[in-house]
Structure formats: structure tokens, C-alpha cells
């Protein structure tokens, strides 16, 4: 995966855990070692959204310490905040230079697994539902429209929203995701990057009609699946929990009109493989196309016959769900560091 994540002008992802120090824990309340932040930085990640349903797993202190660790690792973050002043500094917006194009990033979650945010810490988490501890079905239009208006006031070239939404283990988006996407696009979002389902969901352009009759179009990736996790059909009995993709978006700014658009979309099909021996798990994030080609040319050092069948299943899943037409990234670029 590093060849792809390191070569991009800007790499973003969803950090769905806390970094609260030992003792570490898995499901249902996550806490990972601090090394994860440094590892992500070392393979080229530039920004993570920390707004998801697990960000409150260790309470406000866990949320706060997670951001401290990310700062120490020099990994930018969006979606959660330690103080009111930290939120007010940029109104929940992080502006990044992406290959000479300015992009405003915002991060939101549907909820927190029922864990409430204390009244005096309301600033700490960006959520897009009013009922974020309940049904999670009432859009906070006032909050979203206000923060997107602020993002627009910055006059960046593009606005990207990273959002935790949808239903776990569903390979299609639901009507509420589409409703939220339409609201975001109509209020200025150009790109929407979704997560939460733990399996891939469709991607593509979406056009909305505004109140004045004009239209506005944005690109939506409803979910890319698990970039790395211990989930697989064998562990959770759900297909495609080990299937993911690295999304690559090409942004182009017109020198005459100054308009910036997404001019190319592609993805890299990936498979998360546990090569553990039973004593210790060892997870690899495999480039599906590259290893299928290696196996076909006689190199079975990684792509054994057993692994090959998993690669084919992952490729079929990506093509069926994400669209075969977007699988055109080609061979991985050369990495620049060890």
C-alpha cells in the first residue's frame, strides 16, 4: 500500500480508534498503540478524520489524547477538538495545499454508539445528526450549512467532506446517505469521502438541483471498506470485510476560469490478508492487480494458489460494487523512502 499512499500529493483516511495509551483494546471500545499514528505518517498519510462512532470509546480524555498523539506524529486531523478555542480557530475546517490546489476538509460522524458528549464539551465532536445518540436520522442542517458556508468563505479551490455514515456490512448506500450527500453538495461540497460500512459501497458523481433551478455536481465515495482491520469473512461472517480500495482523485484547476474539478477517478483494489501462524497475527495490505499479475507470471511467493482465490474474490467485489471502469490506476509508483 505504501507505494500508493506515499506517491499521492495528499493522502487522507479515517482513523477509527482512539490512541489513549495502554491497556489496549479491540471491539467494542477501541484503543490502539501510539505507534499507529507514526506508522500512518511514515507511509504518506497527511490527514485523518477522527470523527467516527468510536472516537468517544475512551471518553473525552481518550479523544483529547488521540489528538495529542497525532500532533506529536505531525499527522493532521479533522472532526474532533480538545477545546472550544481549537474548534473556533478554523470552525472545523482544515485547509491543505494539494499539489498547488487548496482544499478545505471537514469531518463528521453520524453518532458515537450511544455515548453522549458532555454539555460542556459540545465543541469536541462534529456530528451531522441532531439525534446522534439515538436514531441518528435527523440531519443537523443548521450546523452543516453554517460550517460549509464558512468553508466557502475561505475561497479554497475545492471542499471535501469526510463523513462516517450508512449501515455496517451493506454494500449499497441507503436513502439517508443519499439525502445527506445531496444536502452537502447543495451547500458547497465537491467531494464526499465516506466510511463506516466496513465493506465497499458505490462511488460516482451525483447532481442536485438547487432552489433557483440550477444544478450542482459532486463526487461521492460512499465507502471504501476497511483499509486495515482484523475483519474478514472468516471472523465476522460477512463478505468483503477484507476487501478495500485506495481511491485516487485527480484535481485540475483551469488557469483561465480558476475553476477546479475532479478530472479523473481511479482506485486500486486491495486485500487485507492475515498471514499469522496462530501465535501472532500478521496483516498485509495487498495490491490485488499486482499480485494477480505476479501469480500469472509464475511468482507465487506471496500469491499462493490459496491467496490467489482471495485476490480474485476481492477483485470481483471491487468491480461489482465500485465499478470496473474505475479500476485503472495501473502499476504502483516507486516509493521514495525505505
List each model region and its residues:
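Acidic, metal/ion-coordinating pockets
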Residues: 1-338
Amino acid at each position: 500500500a505504501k507505494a500508493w499512499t506515499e506517491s499521492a500529493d495528499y493522502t487522507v483516511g479515517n482513523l477509527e480508534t482512539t490512541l489513549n495509551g495502554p491497556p489496549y483494546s479491540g471491539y467494542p471500545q477501541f484503543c490502539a498503540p501510539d505507534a499507529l499514528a507514526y506508522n500512518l505518517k511514515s507511509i504518506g498519510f497527511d490527514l485523518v478524520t477522527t470523527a467516527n462512532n468510536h472516537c468517544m470509546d475512551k471518553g473525552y480524555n481518550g479523544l483529547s489524547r488521540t489528538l495529542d498523539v497525532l500532533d506529536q506524529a505531525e499527522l493532521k486531523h479533522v472532526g474532533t477538538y480538545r477545546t472550544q478555542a481549537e474548534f473556533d480557530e478554523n470552525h472545523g475546517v482544515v485547509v491543505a495545499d494539494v499539489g498547488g490546489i487548496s482544499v478545505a476538509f471537514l469531518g463528521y460522524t453520524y453518532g458515537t454508539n450511544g455515548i453522549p458528549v458532555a454539555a460542556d464539551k459540545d465543541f469536541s465532536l462534529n456530528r451531522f445528526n441532531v439525534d446522534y445518540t439515538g436514531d441518528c436520522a435527523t440531519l443537523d442542517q443548521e450546523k452543516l450549512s453554517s460550517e460549509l458556508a464558512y468553508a466557502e468563505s475561505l475561497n479554497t479551490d475545492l471542499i471535501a467532506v469526510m463523513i462516517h455514515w450508512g449501515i455496517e456490512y451493506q454494500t449499497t448506500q441507503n436513502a439517508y446517505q443519499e439525502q445527506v450527500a445531496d444536502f452537502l453538495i447543495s451547500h458547497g461540497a465537491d467531494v464526499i469521502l465516506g466510511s463506516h460500512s466496513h465493506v465497499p459501497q458505490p462511488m460516482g458523481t451525483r447532481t442536485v438541483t438547487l432552489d433557483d433551478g440550477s444544478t450542482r455536481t459532486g463526487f461521492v465515495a460512499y465507502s471504501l471498506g476497511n483499509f486495515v482491520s482484523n475483519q474478514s469473512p472468516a471472523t465476522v461472517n460477512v463478505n468483503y470485510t477484507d476487501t478495500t480500495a485506495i481511491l485516487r482523485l485527480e484535481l485540475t484547476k483551469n488557469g483561465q476560469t480558476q475553476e477546479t474539478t475532479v478530472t479523473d477517478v481511479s482506485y486500486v483494489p486491495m486485500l487485507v490478508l492475515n498471514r499469522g501462524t496462530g501465535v501472532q497475527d500478521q496483516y498485509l495490505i495487498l495490491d490485488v492487480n499486482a499480485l494477480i499479475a505476479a501469480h500469472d507470471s509464475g511468482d507465487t511467493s506471496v500469491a499462493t494458489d490459496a491467496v490467489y482465490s482471495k485476490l480474485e474474490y476481492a477483485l470481483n467485489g471491487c468491480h461489482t460494487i465500485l465499478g470496473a471502469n474505475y479500476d485503472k490506476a495501473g502499476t504502483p509508483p516507486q516509493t521514495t523512502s525505505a
